[in-house]
Amino acid sequence: MIYQMQMPAKIEVDESSHTDCFGRFIAQPLERGYGVTLGNVMRRVLLASLPGTAITGIKIDGVFHEFAAIDGVREDVPEIVLNLKKVRFKSTCKRNCKTSLTLVGPMDFTAGDIIAQEGEFEVLNKDMHVATINAGATVKIDLYIGRGRGYMPAEENRPEGMPIGYIAVDAIYTPIRNVKFTVENTRVGQRTDYEKMILDVETDGSVSPDDSISLAGKIITDHVTFFANFSPTEEEFTEEEFKQQDDEFETMRRLFHTKIEDLDLSVRSHNCLRLAEIDTIGELVSHKEDELLNYKNFGKKSLTELKEQLEKFDLKFGMDITKYQMK
């Protein structure tokens, strides 16, 4: 007889404390020891693996290194960099971007003065102080904004081809401000040695607590699946079968790299995809239907047309194309 482990029927949400930025989630009952096991892995993934947007570098006219002072500005460059690291963004754009600012004093330069030139992002903490520009001073600054996961130190944030005076910034991509968990005993029938895990998640507002734990759970599941599907006996393939697999893989890889312009689409659908910055079939199928409908001017008619085109290639929305090394 196989022992049936206790599993939570569902994840409970503490509605009394729930906000757009904070959530308390309760998982019970759990077998003894699983509260700490699940709490640790959820905390690590939430803090280190969720995607977000952050400033990755800056360039200030007349400044050539990160330890300089700026004429007419109260703060020096290191202090300005520290303040910019705290600016939080909400973005649906997957590409890096740059925004240029001209600051004329006297003024209090805050995060709200950072404006996307093409609507790529939204600043969440608009009142965040960055610098004080004195009367008569004019400062021109370029901000480089990128997408990533977790945290990336400045020394790894120096792409090739950057202009002289480019200053790399420690990028705090993670949208999670804080995660903590506690484990308590709970009763099932006459037994009191089961566990209840309480997980507190605080975000910066760019993602909801509910979505953050859902995404973290998916990341964990994707990794654990490799172990669940493990077979100690490897299948034996003939040379012809290996060649067939390689040919099929290469065919799919080329298909996913095919440009959207090569599809027989209406002008409206082409324009919708261009505005959404979807350039290839691979980028298209990696989106879910509801994600596409969230883009500006993207309606059900365009979605139906795209589905018909994808069906010609036996493709669908929401596909995982990571193994085809899409770039």
From Swiss-Prot:
**Alphabetically, which GO biological process terms does the record hold?**
DNA-templated transcription
Q: Which reaction does it catalyse?
A: RNA(n) + a ribonucleoside 5'-triphosphate = RNA(n+1) + diphosphate
The annotated region (Alpha N-terminal domain (alpha-NTD)) lies at 1-231
Q: Which UniProt keywords apply?
A: DNA-directed RNA polymerase, Nucleotidyltransferase, Transcription, Transferase
Tell me yes or no: is Cell membrane among this UniProt entry's keywords. no
Q: Name one Pfam family in it.
A: RNA_pol_A_bac
The domain comment in this protein's record states: The N-terminal domain is essential for RNAP assembly and basal transcription, whereas the C-terminal domain is involved in interaction with transcriptional regulators and with upstream promoter elements.
> Which family would the database say this protein is a member of?
Belongs to the RNA polymerase alpha chain family.
Protein name, entry field: DNA-directed RNA polymerase subunit alpha
Q: Which organism is it from?
A: Pelodictyon phaeoclathratiforme (strain DSM 5477 / BU-1)
Gene of origin? Answer: rpoA
